[in-house]
């Protein structure tokens, strides 16, 4: 009887191991070897192509790979929008692999439309997902003057972002 409980316990813990492993960075992800913003081209929700060379200059750049139907992504967008006044010196690049209509609905819902410091759309060449190899969304990469500061594999804590941006 005791062996059955021990075996069941081992199976239970073994079942959780793959879930924990999914949150660890892919050791071959290119961003681990290159700390600069990668070359990319995003089709924004207004149909314009935006590349890394054309993006507006801000002190910080925050690249977020998201899915419009992801609850954690919705929370992230809501928090960033709630504290938008703290992020005036940050360019947000929201990239999704989903269809443009879903991305537009997300942008409207979370007030990400017509903001000078927000680019939201789709990377048709999957350059950003290939560079970061996110295991889940939202995946957040924060840069200062084009150099990688920090990566958040499971979404960023807005208050931590604010502290970094404010230099605290």
Named regions from a protein language model:
Residues 1-27, 168:
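Bacterial Sec-dependent N-terminal signal peptides
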Residues 22-53:
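N-terminal "domain-start" segment that seeds a small globular fold
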Residues 38, 88, 114-118:
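A short helix-to-beta-strand connector/capping loop
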Residues 52-74, 80:
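Short active-site neighborhood of thiol/selenol oxidoreductases, capturing the structured segment around
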Residues 64, 93-95, 119:
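Structural recognition of the beta-strand scaffold that forms the well-ordered cores
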Residues 74-111, 127-130:
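Structural microenvironment flanking redox-active thiols in thiol-disulfide oxidoreductases
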Residues 110-141:
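Short, internal strand/loop/helix patches
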Residues 143-168:
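Thiol-/selenol-based redox modules, centered on thioredoxin-like
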């Amino acid at each position: 009887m005791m062996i059955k409980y021990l075996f069941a316990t081992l199976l239970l813990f073994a079942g959780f191991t793959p879930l924990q492993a999914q949150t660890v960075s892919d050791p071959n992800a290119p961003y681990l070897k290159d700390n600069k913003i990668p070359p990319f081209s995003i089709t924004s929700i207004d149909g314009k192509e935006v590349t890394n060379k054309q993006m507006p200059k801000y002190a910080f750049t925050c690249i977020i790979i998201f899915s419009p139907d992801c609850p954690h992504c919705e929370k992230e967008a809501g928090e960033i929008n709630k504290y938008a006044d703290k992020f005036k010196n940050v360019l947000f690049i929201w990239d999704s692999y989903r269809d443009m209509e879903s991305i537009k609905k997300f942008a409207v819902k979370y007030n990400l439309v017509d903001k000078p410091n927000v680019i939201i759309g789709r990377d048709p060449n999957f350059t950003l997902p290939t560079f970061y190899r996110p295991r889940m969304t939202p995946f957040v990469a924060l840069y200062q003057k084009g150099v990688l500061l920090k990566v958040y594999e499971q979404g960023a804590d807005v208050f931590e972002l604010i502290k970094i941006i404010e230099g605290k």
